[in-house]
From Swiss-Prot:
InterPro entries: Expan_Lol_pI, Expansin, Expansin/allergen_DPBB_dom, Expansin_CBD, Expansin_CBD_sf, RlpA-like_DPBB, RlpA-like_sf. The keyword Cell wall biogenesis/degradation applies. CDD domains: DPBB_EXPA_N. Residues 58-171 form the Expansin-like EG45 domain. This is Expansin-A13. Pfam families: DPBB_1, Expansin_C. The gene is EXPA13. Residues 1-19 form the signal peptide. GO terms for cellular component: extracellular region; membrane. GO terms for biological process: anatomical structure morphogenesis; plant-type cell wall loosening. It is a peripheral membrane protein. Residues 181-260 form the Expansin-like CBD domain. It is found in: Secreted, Cell wall; Membrane.
Amino acid sequence: MQRFLLPLLFLALSPPAICHYSSSTSSPSSSSVSSDASEWRPARATYYAATNPRDAVGGACGYGDLVKSGYGMATVGLSETLFERGQICGACFELRCVDDLRWCIPGTSIILTATNFCAPNYGFDPDGGGHCNPPNKHFVLPIEAFEKIAIWKAGNMPVQYRRINCRKEGSMRFTVDGGGIFISVLITNVAGSGDIAAVKIKGSRTGWLPMGRNWGQNWHINADLRNQALSFEVTSSDRSTVTSYNVSPKNWNYGQTFEGKQFETP
């Protein structure tokens, strides 16, 4: 058995309350392949066995507790070639096992959301133990996900993958954190392309202000927006834009999560 553990960023997060202040559009609860899915490409995949509940907390995309944030164990860590310095966080991939009749489960595939980064190990060659070294395209799955497409004894397994549209249940979520005039917003449960290219924030007494990517899907700005209702404009990697007005009341507090509108998924 080959165990491949992701480097996790452990965060001490308490579950925030989710508040509803604006109307939103829901998408189907189950993920499925979109009609415009990209072509299958070759890669390899390994797995890790989560032996502690904290193994589902953290990750380089900043989602915190993956179960409480709605991603569960249908998640994946990406090698440096695929990770794009965190810009790919939230994107959805379909994987299937290929080329090994001993270990593949025929006719199966699995849909996963990118939530973590598999760091390269330059002490090994890419064809040796450096599975996540450039230029390798490598996926690291929880064993619960890996076993849906292959027998666990497969170890470092040839797979095929493709990007697909994300289908999420419910609304896009905005978790506001920070302090003083520093505001950090974690955006989760994003449908459509799943990954985010740009974010703007607006207070009820300001115009639209561009936010910067802090890390993963955490976006930040230095602005005093206290005692103002907050609105968000989110642009995905496919250039679709969704604007959610007044998702929070003016007396919002750091640590709260609010729901806005959602990207439509074909």
